[in-house]
Amino acid sequence: TLIDDTLLDEGRPNVVAAVMITESGDDSAAVVAWAEVSTGRFELFEAGGADMAAEIARLGPSELLYVETADGVAPPRVERLKEAAGCPLTARPVWTFRQRDAVDTVLEQYGVTTLDGFGLDEDDPAIGAAGALIRYLQETQSPGLGAGDGRLGHLRPPKRQACGGSLMIDAASLRSLEIERTMRTGQVEGSLLSVLQRCVTPMGKRLLRHWLCYPLVDRQAIEARQNVVAAFVRDPDLARDLCRQLDGVQDLARIVG
């Protein structure tokens, strides 16, 4: 997973995710831990069946980690998640996902003795995925991201991803609506995102992508966003002045991260 800002797409989050299936069956639950490597954002969520595929598709990871199997073949559900995300799979040792080992990895990463301060429980299945992801990042990322003792100094504490605040768009709908990429070429050019993308900062470009992939469902939040847009429509001089002020602003999220 790339971390050099000069090689990254400034309009997309640079996400690596770890998935762990916690139940058997096609509609079984699975947990995911994901990190935006260049900014340090670190979140966990749980979903089942089609919902998980939809979440993975919207998240758009560049790499998906999973628990290695004895025969070296990824389980069918993991393969479906790979297809939804359109990213490569990486098998990781079983022990990195084991609850006790994963808890120890998380505690050591943040130099704490309990997860209570993060609002997490040591029995939370998502900690297994979180520990495996941290271990992988420690092994693969640049020493420049470390704290000098094997820890990732830029990685924020994990938190539960808030679910239910946006419209669920399944992977097939994301493709057919051509929200982010066209069906014919698989490229951004020609998609809805490319038509609307007029943001002048890298942070704005990623935010617009997020808004399109995670449409609001709360009426008050929708109206609040519309009111801001209306204010700029009524005052084009203000809009132009703001664009001038923002033009040239560097990717602060990745610089700070």
Predicted regions mapped to residue ranges:
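Charged catalytic and DNA/RNA-contacting regions of genome-maintenance
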Residues: 1-234, 240, 244-257
